[in-house]
Amino acid sequence: DLVEIECQRWKGKGVNIKYEVRGNRKGYKAGALKEGLKHDYVQECEYIAMFDADFQPESDFLMRTVPFLVHNPEIALVQTRWKFVNSDECLLTRFQEMSLDYHFKFEQEAGSVVYSFFGFNGTAGVWRISAIDDAGGWKDRTTVEDMDLAVRTALQGWKFVYVGDVKVRSELPSTFKAYRFQQHRWSCGPANLFKKMLMEILENKKVSFWNKIHLLYDFFFVGKIAAHTVTFMYYCFAIPLSVFFPEIQIPLWGVVYVPSVITLCKALGSPSSFHLVILWVLFENVMSLHRIKAAVTGLLDAGRVNEWVVTEKLGDASKIKPTIDVLDAVKVIDVELTTPLVPKLKKRRTRFWEKYNCSEIFVGTCIIISGCYDMLYAKKGYYIYLFIQGIAFLVVGFEYIGTRPP
């Protein structure tokens, strides 16, 4: 309602602005965007700027982005960078900032410079409407409608530009439950899209062979599937397993040097959080298990593949401590004491596997056991890492991270 009031205020000043809502959730975000482009006034526009509800663009946003589209008719999308207003709220938000800073500073920048292609982030970007139409419009076949449109647009020969010096303020999910749902969608959706678009990409005649290789191998296979799988299988399976089997020998460069170099490169995206890099790596190793399960769900097109849970953003509510008026408290106590016959609603007991993340707890326990075996018998010297990594799995498994731990 605040948005509607604000729109009415600007309309009263003579600004051509409209407030539109729809009465259903068909197609989720893709359905809303598709329906939004059907309005008559959209036909008078060449470009569309997109922002999620928690994004706060600066007043000069359009002045700094639209000229790229005006002066280069080959460009379909101008993507800007996200800036986070609550990155210091808790350790979970700091980890997210580190991951997303790396994504924008390196992945998006490299894709823009080398291939003129990258995945649209779903918000904080400006699209050329004719490019959207050329690609077939918004589709709700997956939960990553933004990536779906970006890939189809690239296959039509359009180019993308990433403008890293334009930053739009936004909010990070501060509860682990919300973050977990978000990561499921961000991992399951791309894998599902990869499966559905594989032949379409291979049969396309408008893009070069090397661009197809970039799309299929670099963007989809390595970036969305293999990266999570290799991380988990190496750090959380191969190293613990080598403790029990002396035949499995992992060279020192594979255990220390290469992982250290990769970690340091990723940490360059957030210099202010460099001191958290070890904890961040441990957390990313834990999350790789969740992302693998989501990616497999997407590849198999099963289970929660089309599940869409809106990411919870608390805003200022996370900073407000719940209070109760003294008189209200007395009234509640009085009711409890004077009306003993009033039936109480029984709260359903939450089962252990519903409240906690059992797969993370199981893996963490196994890693700690391997650490104990290494310390007592194998003597390979991995036990310090194994203990720390195992504890990280247990912390996430019992959800003692974020602003609302159990």
Task: Label the model's feature ranges.
Residues 221-314, 360-406:
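Membrane-embedded multi-pass helical conduit in multi-pass membrane proteins
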Residues 164-178, 306:
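Active-site donor/metal-binding and catalytic loop motifs
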Residues 81, 157, 161-169:
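Catalytic beta-strand/loop signature of glycosyltransferases that borders the donor
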Residues 7-47, 59-143, 148, 154-155, ...:
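Long helical/loop segments within the catalytic core of UDP-sugar-dependent glycosyltransferases
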Residues 20-22, 163-165, 311:
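Conserved beta-strand termini and adjacent loop/short-helix elements that scaffold enzyme active sites
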Residues 204-230, 315-376:
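Loop-to-transmembrane boundary segments
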